[in-house]
Design a protein with these regions (language model features):
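Amphipathic alpha-helical transducer elements in NTP-driven molecular machines
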Residues: 122, 174-177, 181, 200-208, ...
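Low-complexity, acidic/Ser/Thr- and charged residue-rich accessory regions of DNA metabolism proteins
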Residues: 35-36, 57, 73-93, 97, ...
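Conserved, well-folded catalytic cores of nucleic-acid-processing
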Residues: 64, 77, 128-132, 158, ...
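Long, highly charged, low-complexity intrinsically disordered interaction regions
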Residues: 239-337, 352-388, 413-441, 450-456, ...
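Residue-level signature of catalytic and energy-coupling elements of molecular machines
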Residues: 61, 143, 192, 258, ...
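A glycine-rich phosphate-binding loop feature that marks nucleotide/adenosyl-phosphate handling sites
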Residues: 4-10, 142-146, 198-202, 223-230, ...
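Duplex nucleic acid-engaging cores and interfaces of nucleic-acid transaction enzymes
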Residues: 1-141, 145-243
Length: 500
């Protein structure tokens, strides 16, 4: 059986054919209407697309192996003394073994494609969550709309909601410009974040003209609003802004995504963020587990300010679950700001084991002990205190000194090196080393584009066949895998990432 399966995999072809020719010209699966490829060469995204098209009754999919060659090779494995044995082998092969093996090959192809899809999604999500924040700026978040108007929400430097207004660019474009200019001056806005949904191009033009005509000292950028509507209707949003309409919550979310993408995006189910590849066609349990792992990894890599983090962010910190995260927020609300890592032990439910797991990831800028605002774990404070004077005075820390510290504190060299790095560059944020969002004062439309023009953009999504890039117009540009580099690219994720 294993021999047959391997031979089928190496030699059989996959064919798909449209079921209703009348739908061919309008079907989204048009390319699969008469599709064929060796099974081993079918790309993962093609497998998932074929499965979906077959499930929706648009096409039929078949695997066609070379039965005769396989049978001949199979006969050679046996000493056939008469035709009876040959007929028995042929019958069992065609009626039992071959159909079973073909089903297994389809299942294997699907499993591999799903695993690949989950890997692509998790990689894209990681890079999206690591998008650098625009810190210390007052932001005007704009959620474009047509029928009910465009919602605008002003936020202070910390993301606190200041006020909102609504403009209708369809019916009163000039009044919209006046409203934006007034808000910029009234709230001291420094950056404008425009959601990329329906009506985005008109709103960008309105903002651009307002900046130029009113001589406003601000810039704007386009923010991916995938999942903003999901957040707006969520329990988290209702708890944060119970008195606000959900459309205003959406504008707040867009603005906060620019100020601190990680803190805002963790409030949304990762599957709603829109950086996947056929994510609805894969095993949802496996997908959820993998995406949660990615979010937890990024949150712990960046670190969390214990006094400003939401319940949604805290629950991803190592050792902290949703229930404990709510207890931390409740403690903070009742007692005021937490002033030391040692105080964490006073929170109900946060025992010694949990403290050991989470303390190094929770930062406290308000603490009198500067180490409470670093990656250094409390169990290594004594070691850090010995190293700090040496680093401050820029003295060389020799191997002999490190060996002495290792023996004294029972730690490895990696721990010592990590502490030295943190003390040299306290409060380092891994996101600071990545490309910042593109800020602009003018706007492009599709008609402005000319062949040969060089434009800058931000990668929104990376898939097997290329990358989707936001270049500041309504339409998202596709950079095909063949155009990504001057050299051969096997996997776009090897050379390009979401957020770049």
């Amino acid at each position: 059986r294993a021999f047959i399966k391997q031979h089928f995999y190496n030699n059989c072809k996959l064919y798909s054919k449209g079921i209703d020719d009348a739908k061919k010209d309008t079907s989204v699966y048009q390319m699969y209407w008469d599709f064929s490829s060796p099974l081993k060469d079918v790309k993962p995204h093609h497998v998932l697309a074929l499965n979906r098209a077959e499930r929706e009754g648009e096409i039929s999919v078949n695997l066609e192996p070379d039965y005769e060659t396989t049978l001949t090779m199979f006969y050679d494995q046996f000493n056939l003394v008469n035709s009876y044995y040959k007929e028995a082998i042929q019958d069992s092969f065609e009626r039992l073994i071959a159909p079973s093996v073909l089903r297994e090959l389809r299942s294997d192809a699907t499993e591999h494609a799903e695993l690949h899809s989950i890997t692509v999604f998790s990689t894209n999500l990681k890079h999206l969550l690591l998008t650098p924040p625009i810190k210390g700026n007052r932001v005007l978040g704009i959620d474009p709309g047509i029928r009910t108007g465009t919602k605008c929400a002003a936020l202070d430097e910390t993301g606190k909601f200041l006020g909102y207004f609504i403009i209708n660019q369809e019916h009163n474009f000039e009044a919209g410009k006046e409203a934006v200019a007034k808000a910029v001056k009234e709230y001291g806005i420094q950056v404008i974040a425009v959601g990329n949904g329906t009506g985005s191009s008109d709103v960008c033009r309105l903002v651009s003209e307002a900046i130029q005509e009113k001589q406003l000292n601000v810039q704007f950028t386009i923010v991916d609003e995938d999942g903003a509507s999901v957040y707006s209707a969520s329990e988290i949003a209702r708890e944060e802004f119970p008195e606000l309409d959900l459309t205003i919550r959406g504008a707040i979310s867009i603005g906060r995504r620019l100020q601190d993408p990680l803190a805002e995006l963790v409030k949304i189910d990762p599957k709603s963020i829109g950086v996947g590849l056929y994510q609805h066609d894969v095993n949802q349990k496996n997908l959820t587990e993998k995406l949660d792992e990615v979010v937890e990894s990024v949150v712990n890599n960046v670190g969390v300010n214990i006094n400003t983090a939401s319940h949604a962010l805290l629950k991803y910190v190592s050792g902290i679950n949703s229930l404990l995260a709510k207890k931390i927020v409740k403690y903070r609300d009742e007692k005021g700001k937490i002033v030391s890592r040692e105080e964490l032990k006073n929170i109900p439910g946060l025992g010694d084991k949990t403290f050991e797991q989470c303390a190094g990831f929770l930062k406290i800028p308000e603490s009198e002990n500067p180490l409470d605002n670093t990656w250094v774990h409390p169990e290594n404070y004594a070691l850090a205190s010995e190293l700090y004077p040496l680093i401050k005075e820029q003295k060389e820390i020799t191997k002999a000194m490190k060996d002495q510290l290792k023996n004294k504190y029972g730690v490895g060299e990696t721990t010592i090196e990590d502490i030295i790095l943190e003390l040299k560059k306290p409060n380092r944020d891994p996101r600071d080393e990545l490309p910042k969002p593109l800020l602009q004062t003018g706007v492009l439309v599709f008609e402005d584009l000319k062949e040969g023009m060089i434009v800058t953009g931000k990668v929104k999504n990376v898939v097997d066949f290329g990358a989707f890039v936001d270049i500041g117009i309504k339409e998202t540009a596709l950079v095909h895998i063949s155009e990504i580099s001057d050299t051969f690219v096997k996997n776009p994720l090897d050379v390009i990432k979401v957020g770049e």
